[in-house]
């Protein structure tokens, strides 16, 4: 007899059980991942909603103006301080928002305040709204609609303190230190588009001034003519002596002409040196001006590329919903792939079992 572990039926059963375990494990992993991703997406949505709420509150507060004001709660019909004054934080605030005035006060032990109403001098009830209700600190912030010029408010409250079995209704009057003042409107940010600086066009360099070449007057050699007195001499000279005199005068003339030519060359050389030096200095000045202008143009172009400052951009609210949609799509795709794989494995098992 063959052993049980060599039997084909036993092997197929073992394979099917192993495949069942694998499919159950993959299914549990998929379900766990879906639960985790769903919780993560909920946390992300909650965080984005919180940031949106804080941004909206900041914009609302920025549009309102406020000013602190002192007050005292006194007993009805007298100027004596009431116990109710100890259950309110000092000082209060006068707030102007959307062209409406509010007196803002913070109530301590808010759980004791079962009812509170405020009236003006004409015994007209004023609208009250709860701005913030902090259960942990047991405080409550309220806004009472007022008008500029109010000096006092009449209050009717219902206080219940269960620890001491205190349950009482009474009337007081709230006296301001000064009348409700008028407040200026909050300065709204002007959405002014930043002016983009135009790139400065480089100025065309001025035409190079040609160096003025000084005019050099040619010095003519002075030729000494023989004096008339020599011609007037009546003495006769021998022809040999006359020829000697003529040779001497010609040599003197040649010496004088060579000296004048040398002097002229000496005068012309320093003049040329001065002219060349001036032309070189002018050329250097023009090249320096060109380099400075090109540097200015490049700097202005870099500033223009950088664009306007970030301080003029308004605060943008974070984009909500995109991350949750992406997570949902990815999870659905992953789940469908896992299901298709498990179905294919089951079909394969059934074929083998047949």
Curated annotation (Swiss-Prot):
Residues 1-46 form the signal peptide. GO terms for molecular function: metal ion binding. Heme binds at residues 75, 82, 166. GO terms for cellular component: extracellular region. Induction: Repressed by fur in the presence of iron. It is a peptidoglycan-anchor. It is found in: Secreted, Cell wall. Residues 203-214 have a biased composition (Low complexity). Residues 226-268, 278-298 have a biased composition (Polar residues). It holds the Pfam family Gram_pos_anchor. The modification Pentaglycyl murein peptidoglycan amidated threonine is found at residue 320. A motif (LPXTG sorting signal) lies at residues 317-321. Residues 188-318 are annotated as: Disordered. The keyword Heme applies. SUPFAM superfamilies: NEAT domain-like. Expressed in vivo during infection or colonization by S.aureus. Belongs to the IsdA family. Monomer. Interacts with IsdC. Interacts with IsdB. This is Iron-regulated surface determinant protein A. The gene is isdA.
């Amino acid at each position: 007899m063959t052993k049980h572990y060599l039997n084909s039926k036993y092997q197929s059963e073992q394979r099917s059980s192993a495949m069942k375990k694998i499919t159950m494990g993959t299914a549990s992993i998929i379900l766990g991942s879906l639960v985790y991703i769903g919780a993560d997406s909920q946390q992300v949505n909650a965080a984005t909603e919180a940031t949106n709420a804080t941004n909206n509150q900041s914009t609302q507060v920025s549009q309102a103006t406020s000013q602190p004001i002192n007050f005292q709660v006194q007993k009805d019909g007298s100027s004596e301080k009431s116990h109710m004054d100890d259950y309110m934080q000092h000082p209060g605030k006068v707030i102007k928002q959307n062209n409406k005035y509010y007196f803002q006060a913070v109530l301590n032990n808010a759980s004791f305040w079962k009812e509170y109403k405020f009236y003006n001098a004409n015994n007209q009830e004023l609208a009250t709204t709860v701005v913030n209700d902090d259960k942990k600190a047991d405080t409550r912030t309220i806004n009472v609609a007022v008008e500029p010029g109010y000096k006092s408010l009449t209050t009717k409250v219902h206080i219940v303190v269960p620890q001491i079995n205190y349950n009482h209704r009474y009337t007081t009057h709230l006296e301001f230190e000064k009348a409700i003042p008028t407040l200026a409107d909050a300065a709204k940010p002007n959405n002014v588009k930043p002016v983009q600086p135009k790139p400065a066009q480089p100025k065309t360099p001025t035409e190079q001034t040609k160096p003025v070449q000084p005019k050099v007057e040619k010095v003519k050699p002075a030729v000494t003519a023989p004096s008339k007195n020599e011609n007037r001499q009546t003495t006769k000279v021998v022809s040999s002596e006359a020829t000697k005199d003529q040779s001497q005068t010609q040599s003197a003339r040649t010496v004088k002409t060579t000296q004048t030519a040398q002097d002229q060359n000496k005068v012309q050389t320093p003049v040329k040196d001065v002219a060349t030096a001036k032309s070189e200095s002018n050329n250097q000045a023009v090249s320096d001006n060109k380099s400075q202008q090109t540097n200015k143009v490049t700097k202005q172009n870099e500033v223009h590329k950088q664009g306007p400052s970030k301080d003029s951009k308004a605060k943008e609210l974070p984009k909500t919903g995109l991350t949750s949609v992406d997570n949902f799509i990815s999870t659905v795709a992953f789940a469908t792939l896992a299901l298709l794989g498990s179905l294919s494995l089951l079909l394969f098992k059934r074929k083998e079992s047949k």
